Every structure is written in structure tokens, then in C-alpha cells.
Curated annotation (Swiss-Prot):
Short name of one Pfam family: MinE
InterPro entries: MinE, MinE_sf
Protein family according to the UniProt entry: Belongs to the MinE family.
Protein name: Cell division topological specificity factor
Keywords, comma-separated and alphabetical: Cell cycle, Cell division
Annotated function: Prevents the cell division inhibition by proteins MinC and MinD at internal division sites while permitting inhibition at polar sites. This ensures cell division at the proper site by restricting the formation of a division septum at the midpoint of the long axis of the cell.
Gene3D superfamilies linked: Cell division topological specificity factor MinE (3.30.1070.10)
Keyword Cell division: yes
Top-level lineage group: Bacteria
GO biological process: cell division; regulation of division septum assembly
Protein's gene: minE
Amino acid sequence: MSLLDFFLKSRKENTAKLAKERLQIIVAHERTSRSGPDYLPQLKQDILDVIRKYVQIDPEQVTVQLDKKGEQLSVLELNIMLSDDKPQNADDNTEETKS
């Protein structure tokens, strides 16, 4: 009977070990596939709202990227293609100063 217990016990340990390894792989994959923190889309929207107060921008011309530099440093990179057009409020301000 002890011989049978030996084979069953080692099989259970191998199954548990295999399940643990698979779970670790899944968790590691999920961590790397996440594009960034949960607050990143709202942060992007807030930054764009502030910029829109001063300059007209096309949402298609905006890229936001979060890069990790080491374990403790993250870099948020925001690229915006600005048009050569004058802001809408620029004409209003010049007319008021002329009056």
C-alpha cells in the first residue's frame, strides 16, 4: 500500500506544481500585456482638455506612451502634432486691445 501512496502523492505534487507554474505564466503575461495604469486614459483626457483651452488640436494627432525605466521609474511621453493655424481666441484678444 505504501508503494501505491508513493505514486499517487508524487502525481498530486507534480499536478499542483504544474498548475502553479501555469498560473505564474498567465499572471506574468497579463502584467506585460497591460498598456498602463488604470488612470492613464483619464489622465490623457485631462491633459488634452487643458491643452485645448489654449490650442486647437486633433485627437488623432496625439500619442501617449508610458515606458518603464527600471523597476521604480516610469516615463509618461505625450506627443501632440500642432497645426500652424492661429488659435481661435487670438483674433478676439487683438480686437479687444484695439478698442
